[in-house]
Amino acid sequence: MSSAKPINVYSIPELNQALDEALPSVFARLNYERSYALLDAKLYIGYSIAVVAGLSFFLDKKFERDQIVTYQKLLVGAYFVLSLLFWYFSRFIEKGTVYVGKRRGTKEEIYVKTKFEKNEPLYLVELVQKKKGENSKKELKAKLEVNKVFNESGYLQNDAYFKWFSEQHNVLDTKKNE
């Protein structure tokens, strides 16, 4: 089975997008359900920043400057703190995670981070497996040559992609806890 739409296999951004978009279906076949907790947290922080900015604008339009200086100072401080929190969350907590999944029926979570380096057709994948309630954490870094999962016409071969991830997942399962 291949993807419905061909891509330019010489374009790293297109390769990255196509491979990242296929991750949910691959992990669904591995019995994982997508978790949106990181995305939800990032959205809450972002919406909070927008609310603070909107409230500041509203106060500026409705009241005289003398009446709202203290409130504006508080809102600017809140905006700064929320922006700093957003930056910290993006930089250190989320750090390039493109997929988070929870295995059905267990407390196991998997975090998938992907990237391309130096515009080479090597898809760098980092898998982090955690079990809630236990302090077990397993990590695996792997490289996928994209010509193994795309044909010459630019179609993603989903079965080959799934097989590669299945092999990596098996390696991760056999690793000892770190």
Curated annotation (Swiss-Prot):
<dbReference type="GO" id="GO:0005783">
    <property type="term" value="C:endoplasmic reticulum"/>
</dbReference>
<feature type="topological domain" description="Cytoplasmic">
    <location>
        <begin position="1"/>
        <end position="37"/>
    </location>
</feature>
<comment type="similarity">
    <text>Belongs to the SPCS2 family.</text>
</comment>
<comment type="subunit">
    <text>Component of the signal peptidase complex (SPC) composed of a catalytic subunit SEC11 and three accessory subunits SPC1, SPC2 and SPC3. The complex induces a local thinning of the ER membrane which is used to measure the length of the signal peptide (SP) h-region of protein substrates. This ensures the selectivity of the complex towards h-regions shorter than 18-20 amino acids. SPC associates with the translocon complex. Interacts with SBH1 and SEB2/SBH2.</text>
</comment>
<feature type="topological domain" description="Lumenal">
    <location>
        <begin position="59"/>
        <end position="67"/>
    </location>
</feature>
<dbReference type="GO" id="GO:0006465">
    <property type="term" value="P:signal peptide processing"/>
</dbReference>
<keyword id="KW-0256">Endoplasmic reticulum</keyword>
<keyword id="KW-0812">Transmembrane</keyword>
<dbReference type="GO" id="GO:0045047">
    <property type="term" value="P:protein targeting to ER"/>
</dbReference>
<comment type="function">
    <text>Component of the signal peptidase complex (SPC) which catalyzes the cleavage of N-terminal signal sequences from nascent proteins as they are translocated into the lumen of the endoplasmic reticulum. Enhances the enzymatic activity of SPC and facilitates the interactions between different components of the translocation site.</text>
</comment>
<dbReference type="GO" id="GO:0005789">
    <property type="term" value="C:endoplasmic reticulum membrane"/>
</dbReference>
<dbReference type="Pfam" id="PF06703">
    <property type="entry name" value="SPC25"/>
</dbReference>
<dbReference type="InterPro" id="IPR009582">
    <property type="entry name" value="Spc2/SPCS2"/>
</dbReference>
<keyword id="KW-1133">Transmembrane helix</keyword>
<protein>
    <recommendedName>
        <fullName>Signal peptidase complex subunit 2</fullName>
    </recommendedName>
</protein>
<dbReference type="GO" id="GO:0120236">
    <property type="term" value="P:negative regulation of post-translational protein targeting to membrane, translocation"/>
</dbReference>
<dbReference type="GO" id="GO:0005787">
    <property type="term" value="C:signal peptidase complex"/>
</dbReference>
<feature type="topological domain" description="Cytoplasmic">
    <location>
        <begin position="89"/>
        <end position="178"/>
    </location>
</feature>
<feature type="transmembrane region" description="Helical">
    <location>
        <begin position="38"/>
        <end position="58"/>
    </location>
</feature>
<feature type="transmembrane region" description="Helical">
    <location>
        <begin position="68"/>
        <end position="88"/>
    </location>
</feature>
<keyword id="KW-0472">Membrane</keyword>
